[in-house]
């Protein structure tokens, strides 16, 4: 009896997870032009606005934390993608909801070549304001165009194939 209950609970949790992803829009859902003037610090403590690190065509913005295993797994792929596409007007921006201290310690272990901004709790507020991640889960990635129209979103670990698909199928 106890085993049956556990199985039913696990099935329920599985389908709840699926339903959250099904409810998330995946194409140009809203304009987030307000984000352009959000001011955050980079890893060197310089205050930048999001528009300072946005791409001429697209910006891939990845919300992450050092304690999030899938986030850490994505980092090398995001840096590689950035290096391969930055000349095409595509920017990759990691927006950490961690402290600057934790991010600096993390960067001593893993080399990251794309833009990194340290947002702390402000990062969670930005995610909430974007409004496309009801659970505020990580990793959370959005792609927006030069007009700050959201083109794609992904809740969970992202693959390089998904990024390529996003860029190749997005409105130009």
Q: What spans do the regions from the language model cover?
A:
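Thiol/disulfide oxidoreductase modules built on the thioredoxin-like
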Residues: 109-112, 119-168
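Structural microenvironment flanking redox-active thiols in thiol-disulfide oxidoreductases
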Residues: 73-111, 122-128
């Amino acid at each position: 009896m106890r085993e049956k209950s556990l199985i039913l609970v696990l099935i329920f949790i599985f389908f709840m997870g699926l339903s959250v992803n099904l409810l998330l829009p995946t194409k140009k859902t809203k304009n987030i032009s307000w984000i352009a003037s959000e001011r955050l610090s980079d890893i060197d403590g310089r205050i930048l606005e999001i528009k300072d690190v946005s791409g001429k065509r697209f910006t891939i913005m990845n919300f992450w934390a050092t304690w999030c295993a899938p986030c850490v797994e994505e980092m090398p792929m995001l840096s590689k993608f950035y290096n391969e596409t930055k000349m095409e007007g595509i920017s990759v921006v990691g927006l950490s909801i961690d402290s600057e201290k934790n991010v600096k310690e993390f960067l001593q272990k893993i080399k990251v070549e794309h833009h990194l901004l340290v947002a702390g709790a402000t990062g969670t507020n930005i995610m909430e304001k974007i409004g496309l991640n009801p659970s505020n889960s990580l990793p959370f990635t959005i792609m927006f165009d030069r007009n700050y129209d959201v083109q794609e979103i992904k809740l969970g670990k992202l693959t390089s194939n998904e990024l390529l698909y996003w860029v190749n199928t997005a409105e130009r």
